[in-house]
């Protein structure tokens, strides 16, 4: 459960990302594909090379979904319901991949905003990504 302080940390951290959210989403995807190559199996139709338009496009989708979630921290299940259905029933993404992408997002954000990435912000963002992952996998059952 996200505390009031977590919600503040998340909103402030995401606010500092500003117009770079899509760029950071793509960078996190590239990092995931490189570090965890088995994740590429869910994107056989993608050019997963550095800087590809498809990775950039999907990175923007990831970032937009997270931006939506940040705007609905009190109702993540409602905000992410359609995405949960998509990933569980159509795409059938292995739930472990959400954790892998979450880790890559944390690394990407820490790399771009080291001064703002305090232990408290790190913990809050980690809880947020874990909450998003839980919601996205909730309809697998």
From Swiss-Prot:
User: Which amino acids does the record list as binding heme b?
Assistant: 87
For whether the record's keyword set contains Nucleotide-binding, the answer is no
Q: Which CDD domains match?
A: Hb-alpha-like
Q: What processes does the entry annotate via GO biological process terms?
A: hydrogen peroxide catabolic process
InterPro entries registered for this protein in UniProt: Globin, Globin-like_sf, Globin/Proto, Hemoglobin_a-typ, Hemoglobin_oxygen_transport, Hemoglobin_pi
Q: Which residues carry this modification: N6-succinyllysine?
A: 7, 16, 40
Query: Modified residue Phosphothreonine is at which positions?
Result: 8, 108, 134, 137
Q: Which residues carry this modification: Phosphoserine?
A: 3, 49, 102, 124, 131, 138
- Which GO MF terms are attached to this record? haptoglobin binding; heme binding; iron ion binding; organic acid binding; oxygen binding; oxygen carrier activity; peroxidase activity
Protein's UniProt name: Hemoglobin subunit alpha
**Organism field:** Mesocricetus auratus (Golden hamster)
Tell me the name of the encoding gene: HBA
